Protein backbone atom coordinates (compact mmCIF):
# COMPACT_ATOMS: atom_id res chain seq x y z
CA UNK A 1 0.00 0.00 0.00
CA UNK A 2 1.48 3.37 -1.06
CA UNK A 3 1.49 6.45 1.14
CA UNK A 4 2.00 10.17 0.62
CA UNK A 5 1.56 13.36 2.66
CA UNK A 6 0.60 11.38 5.75
CA UNK A 7 -2.26 9.59 3.95
CA UNK A 8 -2.63 5.92 3.07
CA UNK A 9 -3.76 4.94 -0.39
CA UNK A 10 -5.73 1.77 -1.04
CA UNK A 11 -4.35 -0.67 -3.58
CA UNK A 12 -7.21 -0.11 -6.00
CA UNK A 13 -5.97 -0.29 -9.64
CA UNK A 14 -7.91 2.88 -10.30
CA UNK A 15 -5.99 4.71 -7.59
CA UNK A 16 -2.63 3.41 -8.78
CA UNK A 17 -3.36 4.75 -12.24
CA UNK A 18 -4.57 8.08 -10.89
CA UNK A 19 -2.32 8.51 -7.87
CA UNK A 20 -0.61 11.62 -9.17
CA UNK A 21 -3.98 13.26 -9.83
CA UNK A 22 -5.23 12.35 -6.38
CA UNK A 23 -2.10 13.71 -4.77
CA UNK A 24 -2.42 16.99 -6.60
CA UNK A 25 -6.04 17.47 -5.54
CA UNK A 26 -5.58 16.50 -1.89
CA UNK A 27 -2.61 18.86 -1.53
CA UNK A 28 -4.66 21.94 -2.42
CA UNK A 29 -4.96 23.67 0.99
CA UNK A 30 -7.63 26.15 -0.08
CA UNK A 31 -10.15 23.42 -0.89
CA UNK A 32 -12.51 22.08 1.75
CA UNK A 33 -12.75 18.28 2.19
CA UNK A 34 -16.13 18.33 0.44
CA UNK A 35 -14.75 20.23 -2.57
CA UNK A 36 -11.78 17.83 -2.77
CA UNK A 37 -14.11 14.84 -2.85
CA UNK A 38 -16.20 16.43 -5.57
CA UNK A 39 -13.12 17.13 -7.70
CA UNK A 40 -11.92 13.58 -7.22
CA UNK A 41 -15.33 12.18 -8.13
CA UNK A 42 -15.36 14.24 -11.31
CA UNK A 43 -11.75 13.25 -12.08
CA UNK A 44 -12.42 9.53 -11.78
CA UNK A 45 -15.96 9.57 -13.17
CA UNK A 46 -16.95 6.21 -11.71
CA UNK A 47 -15.70 6.44 -8.15
CA UNK A 48 -16.08 8.68 -5.13
CA UNK A 49 -12.81 9.09 -3.26
CA UNK A 50 -13.03 9.77 0.47
CA UNK A 51 -9.85 11.08 2.09
CA UNK A 52 -9.25 10.71 5.80
CA UNK A 53 -6.15 11.06 7.94
CA UNK A 54 -6.04 7.27 8.25
CA UNK A 55 -6.78 5.99 4.79
CA UNK A 56 -8.26 6.71 1.43
CA UNK A 57 -11.18 4.52 0.42
CA UNK A 58 -13.05 4.16 -2.82
CA UNK A 59 -16.79 3.55 -2.96
CA UNK A 60 -19.12 3.23 -5.95
CA UNK A 61 -20.35 6.72 -6.69
CA UNK A 62 -22.61 6.94 -9.71
CA UNK A 63 -25.62 6.78 -7.38
CA UNK A 64 -23.89 8.85 -4.71
CA UNK A 65 -22.94 11.64 -7.10
CA UNK A 66 -26.45 11.64 -8.53
CA UNK A 67 -27.92 11.76 -5.02
CA UNK A 68 -25.65 14.66 -4.11
CA UNK A 69 -26.82 16.61 -7.15
CA UNK A 70 -30.52 15.78 -6.84
CA UNK A 71 -30.72 15.89 -3.04
CA UNK A 72 -32.32 12.43 -2.99
CA UNK A 73 -31.60 9.03 -1.48
CA UNK A 74 -33.31 5.69 -1.80
CA UNK A 75 -36.99 6.20 -0.91
CA UNK A 76 -38.07 5.01 2.54
CA UNK A 77 -40.73 2.35 2.30
CA UNK A 78 -43.79 2.79 4.53
CA UNK A 79 -45.09 2.12 7.10
CA UNK A 80 -43.08 4.78 8.93
CA UNK A 81 -42.21 5.05 12.60
CA UNK A 82 -43.39 8.41 13.91
CA UNK A 83 -42.71 10.29 17.15
CA UNK A 84 -44.79 13.36 18.03
CA UNK A 85 -44.22 15.48 21.13
CA UNK A 86 -47.17 17.17 22.82
CA UNK A 87 -49.53 14.74 21.16
CA UNK A 88 -52.30 13.85 23.61
CA UNK A 89 -54.60 16.61 22.35
CA UNK A 90 -54.97 19.30 19.70
CA UNK A 91 -52.98 19.19 16.49
CA UNK A 92 -50.49 16.68 17.93
CA UNK A 93 -53.23 14.16 18.61
CA UNK A 94 -54.85 14.82 15.22
CA UNK A 95 -51.51 14.21 13.49
CA UNK A 96 -51.09 10.94 15.41
CA UNK A 97 -54.53 9.76 14.27
CA UNK A 98 -53.83 10.64 10.67
CA UNK A 99 -50.50 8.80 10.63
CA UNK A 100 -52.18 5.77 12.19
CA UNK A 101 -54.92 5.92 9.55
CA UNK A 102 -52.14 5.75 6.94
CA UNK A 103 -50.81 2.55 8.54
CA UNK A 104 -47.82 4.01 10.38
CA UNK A 105 -46.56 3.30 13.91
CA UNK A 106 -46.73 6.23 16.32
CA UNK A 107 -45.19 7.19 19.67
CA UNK A 108 -47.02 9.95 21.54
CA UNK A 109 -46.00 11.78 24.69
CA UNK A 110 -47.04 14.50 27.11
CA UNK A 111 -46.09 15.91 30.50
CA UNK A 112 -49.23 14.27 31.89
CA UNK A 113 -49.02 10.51 32.34
CA UNK A 114 -52.79 10.43 32.77
CA UNK A 115 -53.41 12.13 29.42
CA UNK A 116 -50.94 9.80 27.73
CA UNK A 117 -52.73 6.74 29.09
CA UNK A 118 -56.13 8.05 27.99
CA UNK A 119 -54.91 8.99 24.51
CA UNK A 120 -53.13 5.67 23.93
CA UNK A 121 -56.19 3.71 25.02
CA UNK A 122 -58.44 5.71 22.69
CA UNK A 123 -56.10 5.33 19.72
CA UNK A 124 -55.59 1.60 20.33
CA UNK A 125 -59.34 1.06 20.32
CA UNK A 126 -59.45 2.63 16.87
CA UNK A 127 -56.16 1.47 15.30
CA UNK A 128 -54.93 -1.50 17.30
CA UNK A 129 -51.40 -2.12 18.54
CA UNK A 130 -49.65 0.51 16.45
CA UNK A 131 -49.38 3.24 19.06
CA UNK A 132 -47.18 3.69 22.12
CA UNK A 133 -47.08 6.47 24.67
CA UNK A 134 -44.95 7.69 27.54
CA UNK A 135 -44.69 10.67 29.86
CA UNK A 136 -42.13 13.26 28.79
CA UNK A 137 -41.39 16.82 29.85
CA UNK A 138 -39.49 18.24 26.87
CA UNK A 139 -37.83 20.86 29.08
CA UNK A 140 -35.91 18.10 30.88
CA UNK A 141 -33.00 16.57 28.97
CA UNK A 142 -33.29 13.35 30.97
CA UNK A 143 -36.93 12.96 29.95
CA UNK A 144 -36.14 13.49 26.28
CA UNK A 145 -33.33 10.93 26.37
CA UNK A 146 -35.69 8.47 28.04
CA UNK A 147 -38.22 9.18 25.28
CA UNK A 148 -35.61 8.20 22.72
CA UNK A 149 -34.78 5.01 24.63
CA UNK A 150 -38.48 4.16 24.92
CA UNK A 151 -38.98 4.65 21.18
CA UNK A 152 -35.94 2.56 20.27
CA UNK A 153 -37.07 -0.20 22.61
CA UNK A 154 -40.50 -0.43 21.00
CA UNK A 155 -39.82 0.58 17.39
CA UNK A 156 -36.02 0.23 16.99
CA UNK A 157 -35.82 3.48 15.01
CA UNK A 158 -37.78 6.66 14.23
CA UNK A 159 -38.25 7.89 10.65
CA UNK A 160 -40.16 11.09 11.40
CA UNK A 161 -39.89 13.15 14.60
CA UNK A 162 -42.36 16.04 14.96
CA UNK A 163 -41.65 18.69 17.58
CA UNK A 164 -45.15 19.87 18.45
CA UNK A 165 -44.96 20.46 22.21
CA UNK A 166 -45.52 24.13 22.95
CA UNK A 167 -47.08 26.51 25.45
CA UNK A 168 -48.35 30.07 25.80
CA UNK A 169 -49.07 29.48 29.51
CA UNK A 170 -52.71 30.22 28.59
CA UNK A 171 -51.81 33.85 29.20
CA UNK A 172 -52.86 36.72 26.92
CA UNK A 173 -51.69 40.00 28.40
CA UNK A 174 -49.03 42.66 27.76
CA UNK A 175 -45.49 41.55 28.57
CA UNK A 176 -45.32 44.16 31.34
CA UNK A 177 -48.07 42.26 33.15
CA UNK A 178 -46.73 38.74 32.59
CA UNK A 179 -45.59 36.76 35.61
CA UNK A 180 -42.14 35.24 35.97
CA UNK A 181 -43.72 31.80 36.02
CA UNK A 182 -45.59 32.33 32.74
CA UNK A 183 -42.52 33.67 30.92
CA UNK A 184 -40.35 30.81 32.14
CA UNK A 185 -43.01 28.29 31.13
CA UNK A 186 -43.26 29.67 27.58
CA UNK A 187 -39.53 30.06 26.95
CA UNK A 188 -38.53 26.73 28.51
CA UNK A 189 -41.14 24.76 26.59
CA UNK A 190 -40.94 26.46 23.20
CA UNK A 191 -37.23 27.19 23.01
CA UNK A 192 -35.25 25.02 25.43
CA UNK A 193 -37.62 22.09 24.90
CA UNK A 194 -37.29 22.36 21.14
CA UNK A 195 -33.50 22.49 21.34
CA UNK A 196 -33.33 19.44 23.59
CA UNK A 197 -35.65 17.47 21.32
CA UNK A 198 -33.76 18.46 18.17
CA UNK A 199 -30.46 17.49 19.76
CA UNK A 200 -31.64 14.06 20.85
CA UNK A 201 -33.53 13.43 17.60
CA UNK A 202 -30.44 14.24 15.53
CA UNK A 203 -28.15 12.15 17.73
CA UNK A 204 -30.51 9.21 17.38
CA UNK A 205 -31.01 9.56 13.62
CA UNK A 206 -27.29 9.95 12.95
CA UNK A 207 -26.85 6.40 14.28
CA UNK A 208 -29.60 5.06 12.03
CA UNK A 209 -28.53 3.81 8.62
CA UNK A 210 -31.80 5.11 7.18
CA UNK A 211 -31.39 8.52 8.82
CA UNK A 212 -34.60 10.44 9.42
CA UNK A 213 -36.62 13.63 9.18
CA UNK A 214 -37.27 16.18 11.95
CA UNK A 215 -40.16 18.63 11.67
CA UNK A 216 -40.33 21.73 13.86
CA UNK A 217 -43.77 23.29 14.16
CA UNK A 218 -43.92 27.07 13.92
CA UNK A 219 -46.66 29.39 15.18
CA UNK A 220 -47.79 32.99 15.45
CA UNK A 221 -44.75 35.24 15.28
CA UNK A 222 -42.59 32.87 13.24
CA UNK A 223 -42.81 35.22 10.25
CA UNK A 224 -41.55 38.16 12.29
CA UNK A 225 -44.91 39.90 12.63
CA UNK A 226 -45.79 41.31 16.07
CA UNK A 227 -47.81 39.25 18.51
CA UNK A 228 -49.23 41.75 21.03
CA UNK A 229 -50.53 40.25 24.27
CA UNK A 230 -48.48 37.10 23.76
CA UNK A 231 -45.10 38.59 22.92
CA UNK A 232 -43.11 35.85 24.63
CA UNK A 233 -44.87 33.15 22.62
CA UNK A 234 -44.28 35.02 19.35
CA UNK A 235 -40.62 35.54 20.16
CA UNK A 236 -40.09 31.84 20.84
CA UNK A 237 -41.86 30.87 17.63
CA UNK A 238 -39.70 33.29 15.67
CA UNK A 239 -36.71 31.41 17.06
CA UNK A 240 -38.07 28.13 15.66
CA UNK A 241 -37.32 29.20 12.10
CA UNK A 242 -33.84 30.41 13.05
CA UNK A 243 -33.04 27.20 14.91
CA UNK A 244 -34.21 25.07 12.00
CA UNK A 245 -32.02 27.00 9.55
CA UNK A 246 -29.03 26.77 11.89
CA UNK A 247 -29.42 23.01 12.25
CA UNK A 248 -29.76 22.64 8.48
CA UNK A 249 -26.49 24.56 8.10
CA UNK A 250 -24.73 22.47 10.76
CA UNK A 251 -25.75 19.21 9.10
CA UNK A 252 -24.61 20.53 5.73
CA UNK A 253 -21.24 21.58 7.19
CA UNK A 254 -20.84 18.05 8.55
CA UNK A 255 -21.77 16.63 5.14
CA UNK A 256 -24.70 14.72 6.66
CA UNK A 257 -26.96 13.49 3.88
CA UNK A 258 -29.50 11.28 5.63
CA UNK A 259 -30.83 13.53 8.42
CA UNK A 260 -32.89 16.61 7.53
CA UNK A 261 -34.62 19.27 9.64
CA UNK A 262 -37.80 20.84 8.23
CA UNK A 263 -40.36 23.45 9.25
CA UNK A 264 -44.05 22.63 9.57
CA UNK A 265 -46.73 25.32 9.69
CA UNK A 266 -50.26 24.24 10.68
CA UNK A 267 -51.64 27.78 10.54
CA UNK A 268 -54.44 28.68 12.95
CA UNK A 269 -55.88 25.56 14.55
CA UNK A 270 -58.94 25.58 16.80
CA UNK A 271 -57.13 24.14 19.81
CA UNK A 272 -57.53 25.11 23.47
CA UNK A 273 -54.32 27.11 23.06
CA UNK A 274 -55.79 29.28 20.30
CA UNK A 275 -59.32 29.59 21.63
CA UNK A 276 -58.08 30.80 25.01
CA UNK A 277 -56.99 33.97 23.23
CA UNK A 278 -60.38 34.74 21.65
CA UNK A 279 -60.99 37.70 23.93
CA UNK A 280 -60.83 40.70 21.59
CA UNK A 281 -62.85 41.71 18.54
CA UNK A 282 -59.81 41.40 16.28
CA UNK A 283 -58.87 37.98 17.66
CA UNK A 284 -62.41 36.66 17.18
CA UNK A 285 -62.48 37.95 13.60
CA UNK A 286 -59.28 36.18 12.57
CA UNK A 287 -60.12 32.97 14.41
CA UNK A 288 -63.45 32.74 12.60
CA UNK A 289 -61.93 33.62 9.24
CA UNK A 290 -58.64 31.72 9.25
CA UNK A 291 -58.80 28.90 11.81
CA UNK A 292 -59.55 25.27 10.97
CA UNK A 293 -60.17 22.19 13.13
CA UNK A 294 -57.11 20.10 13.95
CA UNK A 295 -58.50 17.16 11.97
CA UNK A 296 -58.74 19.23 8.78
CA UNK A 297 -55.19 20.51 9.15
CA UNK A 298 -53.81 17.03 9.88
CA UNK A 299 -55.53 15.58 6.81
CA UNK A 300 -53.53 18.03 4.71
CA UNK A 301 -50.20 17.91 6.53
CA UNK A 302 -49.71 14.16 6.98
CA UNK A 303 -49.74 13.17 3.28
CA UNK A 304 -47.31 16.00 2.56
CA UNK A 305 -45.02 14.90 5.39
CA UNK A 306 -45.09 11.24 4.31
CA UNK A 307 -44.37 12.21 0.71
CA UNK A 308 -40.88 13.42 1.66
CA UNK A 309 -39.36 10.10 2.82
CA UNK A 310 -41.42 8.27 0.19
CA UNK A 311 -39.74 10.31 -2.57
CA UNK A 312 -36.26 9.95 -1.12
CA UNK A 313 -35.90 13.72 -0.95
CA UNK A 314 -33.32 14.97 1.54
CA UNK A 315 -33.86 18.67 0.91
CA UNK A 316 -35.14 20.89 3.74
CA UNK A 317 -38.82 21.72 3.30
CA UNK A 318 -41.27 24.23 4.76
CA UNK A 319 -44.75 22.69 4.64
CA UNK A 320 -47.50 25.26 5.13
CA UNK A 321 -51.21 24.63 5.57
CA UNK A 322 -52.27 28.28 5.59
CA UNK A 323 -50.43 30.00 2.76
CA UNK A 324 -50.61 33.73 2.14
CA UNK A 325 -52.91 33.24 -0.84
CA UNK A 326 -55.30 31.10 1.19
CA UNK A 327 -55.37 33.66 3.99
CA UNK A 328 -56.05 36.62 1.70
CA UNK A 329 -58.75 34.67 -0.14
CA UNK A 330 -60.54 33.87 3.12
CA UNK A 331 -60.29 37.45 4.34
CA UNK A 332 -61.66 38.75 1.04
CA UNK A 333 -64.57 36.29 1.20
CA UNK A 334 -65.36 37.46 4.70
CA UNK A 335 -65.19 41.17 3.89
CA UNK A 336 -67.04 40.90 0.59
CA UNK A 337 -69.52 38.12 1.36
CA UNK A 338 -69.63 37.88 5.14
CA UNK A 339 -68.33 34.31 5.01
CA UNK A 340 -67.46 32.45 8.24
CA UNK A 341 -68.82 35.12 10.56
CA UNK A 342 -69.43 33.71 14.07
CA UNK A 343 -68.17 30.33 12.88
CA UNK A 344 -66.39 29.47 16.13
CA UNK A 345 -66.94 32.43 18.43
CA UNK A 346 -69.59 35.13 18.48
CA UNK A 347 -68.27 38.44 17.22
CA UNK A 348 -69.52 41.58 18.89
Curated annotation (Swiss-Prot):
GO terms for cellular component: chloroplast; chloroplast thylakoid membrane; plasma membrane. One of its GO terms (biological process) is PSII associated light-harvesting complex II catabolic process. It is found in: Plastid, Chloroplast thylakoid membrane. Residues 1-61 form a transit peptide. Disulfide bonds: none annotated. It is a peripheral membrane protein. Disruption phenotype: Slower degradation of chlorophyll b during dark incubation. Its EC number is 1.1.1.294. One of its GO terms (molecular function) is chlorophyll(ide) b reductase activity. Belongs to the short-chain dehydrogenases/reductases (SDR) family. Chlorophyll b reductase activity detected in vitro with a recombinant protein produced in a heterologous system. Able to act on the substrate within the protein-chlorophyll LHCII complex. This is Chlorophyll(ide) b reductase NOL, chloroplastic. It comes from Arabidopsis thaliana (Mouse-ear cress).
